[in-house]
């Protein structure tokens, strides 16, 4: 029996990429979906209230003046399609945030996890009745708290550090950890630690020759 697996990685918070990934299973006749890592985006984009229905948004160094609800909705979609997180705020809060990096970090985490939760719900709706599951291991850019959200899903399986038995009969090991980077990301470690991480998973495989190393 032939098994088709669709693999993608590094979607970095983009709603468009997540939805295309979920749709790819049916389009390509895949039996299972694997997302390799780096699910989440890298920045919050402030939507600064200017009074009434008006907001000012700076996206990729371009300033947009929003003047009505339809424009606001479209700009949110545009920001999300690029993997950033829209955050409605006001000039007073912006002044406070400029002096409080911890609060900025908290807002970023809040928005990231909110979107990951939305993605889990989208996956459950799109893949209901298909028999397909998503096997996912967050990457080095993804905060640890992402794992907790994925664990609650009935459709998206957290594969990090596990030996997963796929419906095809193959075993799969998976990890989103990387070697050291200049950016001190969430999941990185020295080469010998990475080797130990993979050796621990490999030692649990029944048939390494027919296994998937993700």
Language-model regions, residue ranges each:
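A short secondary-structure junction signal
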Residues: 146-149, 182-187
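His/acidic metal-ligating clusters that form di-metal
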Residues: 29, 103, 116, 127-130, ...
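Short catalytic-loop micro-motif centered on adjacent basic/acidic residues
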Residues: 5-9, 135-136
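Residue-level marker for buried hydrophobic side chains located in beta-strands
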Residues: 5-7, 33-35, 213
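Short, structured patches in soluble enzyme cores that scaffold and shape functional sites
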Residues: 138, 174-176
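Core catalytic region of metal-dependent phosphoesterases/phosphodiesterases
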Residues: 15-167
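Beta-strand-turn-beta hairpins that frame and shape the catalytic cleft
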Residues: 1-5, 163-174, 206-212
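Short, flexible loop segments at the rims of nucleotide/cofactor-binding pockets, characterized by
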Residues: 8-13, 110-115, 187-190
């Amino acid at each position: 029996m032939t098994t088709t697996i669709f693999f993608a990685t590094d979607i970095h918070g983009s709603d468009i990429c997540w939805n295309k990934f979920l749709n790819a299973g049916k389009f390509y006749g895949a039996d299972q979906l694997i997302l390799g890592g780096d699910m989440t985006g890298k920045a919050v984009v402030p939507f600064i209230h200017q009074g009434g229905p008006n907001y000012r948004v700076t996206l990729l160094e371009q300033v947009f003046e929003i003047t009505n609800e339809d424009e606001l909705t479209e700009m949110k979609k545009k920001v999300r399609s690029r993997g950033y997180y829209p955050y409605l705020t006001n000039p007073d809060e912006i002044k406070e945030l400029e002096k409080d990096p911890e609060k900025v970090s908290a807002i970023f985490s809040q928005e990231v996890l909110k979107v990951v939760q939305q993605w889990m719900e989208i996956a459950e709706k799109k893949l209901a009745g298909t028999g397909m599951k998503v096997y996912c291991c967050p990457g080095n850019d993804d905060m640890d708290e992402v794992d907790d959200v994925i664990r609650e899903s009935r459709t998206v399986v957290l594969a990090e550090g596990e030996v997963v038995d796929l419906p095809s009969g193959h075993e799969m090991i998976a990890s989103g950890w990387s070697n050291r980077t200049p950016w001190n990301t969430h999941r990185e470690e020295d080469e010998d630690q990475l080797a130990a991480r993979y050796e621990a998973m490999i030692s649990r495989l029944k048939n390494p020759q027919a296994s998937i190393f993700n």
